[in-house]
């Protein structure tokens, strides 16, 4: 009885998990508004979910936080130290160059050499230092951080443009693939009817058996073409799911305004405002900001300092009263002053770094010129694509009408014995191609508009045309 109850319990858990999976799948198959996915929904999903968008935005935010890091150089520095030690008191006169290995001794020479006698020592200090005058070095560092922030933001804008364009193009590709599937399925239906008619005529010995074989072969070819069209549509949907950042999800699409051929006028664009061009210019600005930092590097540093310190020692000096066991500080001191430091020999390294940055500026300027050239070429190609797509969209209705009339006439002539099955098959093939061309031609114009908007660096005019 317990075993049967456990089995029933596992069944309920399995059904609950299956329901959660199905609910998640249904939710993923819907657009943000809960209905079929529109092109604008696809773009918004991509901008919200695609990993590259999150990465670029995070990098831009990190660069912006870097400005705050650079500004902290204006703050004073406060160092605190406390020390407890036990050591011998042997000391000698003499000089030691500054180094980090041998510890220093303070106090008079006692003339002792014993390693067995040791005392406690303590020390504490607070040092406040502030660079009062830097001749613009810290400001130059902040300017570098701001230039890097501008570069990161422009790169993020370019990423958003690329991701949104890819999502829109994938959406149009799915619509075109679905239209091709409809045309292929209509062709299969027509050829199925024609094949049945030919079979009846052959069975009644009104047509030779070769006609039936040809009709069945044409039907098989049409079915294969339908399978290929379905495959292309499924692959296109997978690409759309990836483009919107929901890989593996399935969406129901609605064409909306994309079913009609749009009316448009293409205005000339300033390619220097394209996100790619702005990112290239920002990269040049970063190099120039680093060059200005190097211009300020060969200047002195004027630092104000103040300190309070105290020490204690268990060592006894002849003629001086004892300060206790040395575990606590007993002798205080304070000091206030200013120091000037000047990196005299840094001139050589600074000049070498300037030569490096000069070549970096040449490289970034060349990259900017290449970007402008690529954008110009992209715009010219988009205009050519627009011209061809518009002409094709004007011609396909006539193509479809003529192909439909030709197919009707070929079937009628075949029924009357005035045409061969080859003529009918060719008419069917021509009609199928005409239907596919007509269905895809409208989307071709929209795709050309998308390519033009992407070349101009702004999808807003394209999205305004698809609003209901």
Model-based region annotation:
Residues 2, 159-273, 385, 389, ...:
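Periplasmic alpha-helical coiled-coil/stalk elements that build and connect Gram-negative outer-membrane
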Residues 2-14:
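Bacterial N-terminal signal peptides that target proteins for export
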Residues 12-23:
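Bacterial N-terminal signal peptides
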Residues 28-84, 89-92, 131-132, 248, ...:
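Bacterial Sec-pathway N-terminal export signals of envelope proteins
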Residues 36-38, 77-158, 278-290, 297-371, ...:
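Small/polar-residue-enriched beta-strand and adjacent coil segments characteristic
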Residues 55-70, 159, 163-182, 193, ...:
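Amphipathic alpha-helical coiled-coil segments
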Residues 73-75, 163, 208, 298:
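Short, glycine-/polar-rich solvent-exposed loops and beta-turns at beta-strand/coil boundaries
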Residues 205, 245, 417, 456-457:
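Short helix-capping/hinge motifs at transmembrane helix termini and TM-loop junctions
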């Amino acid at each position: 009885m317990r075993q049967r109850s456990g089995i029933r319990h596992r069944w309920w858990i399995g059904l609950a998990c299956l329901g959660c999976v199905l609910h998640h799948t249904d939710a993923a198959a819907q657009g943000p508004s809960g209905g079929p996915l529109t092109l604008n929904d696809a773009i918004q999903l991509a901008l919200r979910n695609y990993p590259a968008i999150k990465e670029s935005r995070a990098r831009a935010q990190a660069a912006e936080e870097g400005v705050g890091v650079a500004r902290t150089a204006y703050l004073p520095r406060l160092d605190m130290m406390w020390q407890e030690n036990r050591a011998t008191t042997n000391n000698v006169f003499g000089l030691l160059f500054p180094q980090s290995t041998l510890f220093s001794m303070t106090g008079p020479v006692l003339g002792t050499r014993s390693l067995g006698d040791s005392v406690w020592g303590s020390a504490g200090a607070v040092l406040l230092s502030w660079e009062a005058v830097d001749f613009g070095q810290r400001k130059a560092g902040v300017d570098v951080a701001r230039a890097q922030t501008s570069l990161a933001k422009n790169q993020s804008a370019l990423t958003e443009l690329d991701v949104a364009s890819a999502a829109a193009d994938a959406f149009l590709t799915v619509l075109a693939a679905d239209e091709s599937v409809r045309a292929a399925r209509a062709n299969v239906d027509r050829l199925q009817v024609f094949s049945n008619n030919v079979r009846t005529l052959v069975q009644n010995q009104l047509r030779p058996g070769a006609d039936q074989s040809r009709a069945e072969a044409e039907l098989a070819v049409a079915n294969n073409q339908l399978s290929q069209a379905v495959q292309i549509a499924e692959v296109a949907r997978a690409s759309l799911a990836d483009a919107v950042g929901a890989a593996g999800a399935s969406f129901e699409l609605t064409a909306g305004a994309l079913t009609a051929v749009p009316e448009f006028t293409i205005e000339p664009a300033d390619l220097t405002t394209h996100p790619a061009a702005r990112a290239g210019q920002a990269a040049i600005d970063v190099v120039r900001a680093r060059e200005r930092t190097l211009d300020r590097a060969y200047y002195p540093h004027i630092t104000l300092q103040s300190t309070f310190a105290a020490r204690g020692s268990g060592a006894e000096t002849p003629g001086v009263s004892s300060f206790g066991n040395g575990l606590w500080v007993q002798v205080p001191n304070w000091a206030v002053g200013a120091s000037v430091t000047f990196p005299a020999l840094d001139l050589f390294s600074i000049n070498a770094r300037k030569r490096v940055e000069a070549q970096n500026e040449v490289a970034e300027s060349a990259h900017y010129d290449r970007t402008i050239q690529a954008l110009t070429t992209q715009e010219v190609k988009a205009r050519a694509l627009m011209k061809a797509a518009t002409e094709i969209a004007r011609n396909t209705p006539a193509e479809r009408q003529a192909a439909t009339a030709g197919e009707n006439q070929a079937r009628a002539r075949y029924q009357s014995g005035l045409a061969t099955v080859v003529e009918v098959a060719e008419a069917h093939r021509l009609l199928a191609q005409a239907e596919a061309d007509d269905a895809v031609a409208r989307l071709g114009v929209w795709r050309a508009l998308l390519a033009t908007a992407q070349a101009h660096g702004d999808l807003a005019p394209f999205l305004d045309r698809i609003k209901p």
